[in-house]
């Protein structure tokens, strides 16, 4: 039976085995999928052992996505753009292919909820790896502009320069934001700590939708704040998690599983409802 895994540290919380088991059942694919906690100082060794022992493919999560980018023999165009790899595949000729499905997963989930991203004015909060991985796929949807806001502007400016050729991208400090947006995406990890990015209320207009890349058993702090300030819709990152997993599954197996039923089952699993 073909063997797959997700590598991270910590990894105990990962829902990837749950998701991929449902995908395999749905598509009638025979495979196993496990979680492996790689030592922080030996990610490369863990990956090499896994593939030497017959592994076919893997997902990579925090904090190893940049290391995976350096490790592979080949990079997909979207992995090159993202500067990080979250999906590894052993090709038929024994090469390790690196891909990045995060941005595609976000866009798929956004389009399910919003249908259209073209012409939208988007605010992206944060300039770390999570944000970098989604800017290219977002710009491919032709929004009117993306504003990258970060506590330190230098990191945001570097990102904006890298993606400037793909569309209109500008930067702002959190405190300087004084306009409203159609869509606000929280790519900071503040929600994990139950905290809020330090942004003014003015970013929420009469038709603002917010999307937090984080998720949990309850609504995230960021989405609760957005709702209190008049956001017309709030979405968490559970759909992105499942959609990027479906994209990885398609890279490995050549078949794309449906996501909506899996999202519902995962939501039940997380909330206990």
UniProtKB/Swiss-Prot annotation:
Residues annotated for shikimate binding in this entry: 14-16, 61, 86, 102, 215
| Matching InterPro entries | Aminoacid_DH-like_N_sf (IPR046346), NAD(P)-bd_dom_sf (IPR036291), SDH_C (IPR041121), Shikimate_DH (IPR011342), Shikimate_DH-bd_N (IPR013708), Shikimate_DH_fam (IPR022893), Shikm_DH/Glu-tRNA_Rdtase (IPR006151)
**Pfam families in alphabetical order:** SDH_C (PF18317), Shikimate_DH (PF01488), Shikimate_dh_N (PF08501)
| SUPFAM superfamilies in alphabetical order | Aminoacid dehydrogenase-like, N-terminal domain, NAD(P)-binding Rossmann-fold domains
Q: Top EC class per UniProt?
A: oxidoreductase
User: Which cysteine-cysteine pairs are annotated as disulfide bonds in the entry?
Assistant: none
Q: Does the keyword Cell membrane apply?
A: no
For NADP(+), which residues are the binding ones? 126-130, 150-155, 213, 237
Q: Supply the EC number(s).
A: 1.1.1.25
Query: What binding partners and quaternary form does the record give?
Result: Homodimer.
Q: What does this protein do?
A: Involved in the biosynthesis of the chorismate, which leads to the biosynthesis of aromatic amino acids. Catalyzes the reversible NADPH linked reduction of 3-dehydroshikimate (DHSA) to yield shikimate (SA).
Q: What is this protein called?
A: Shikimate dehydrogenase (NADP(+))
State the organism of origin: Tolumonas auensis (strain DSM 9187 / NBRC 110442 / TA 4)
Lineage of the species this protein comes from: Bacteria, Pseudomonadati, Pseudomonadota, Gammaproteobacteria, Aeromonadales
The gene coding this protein: aroE
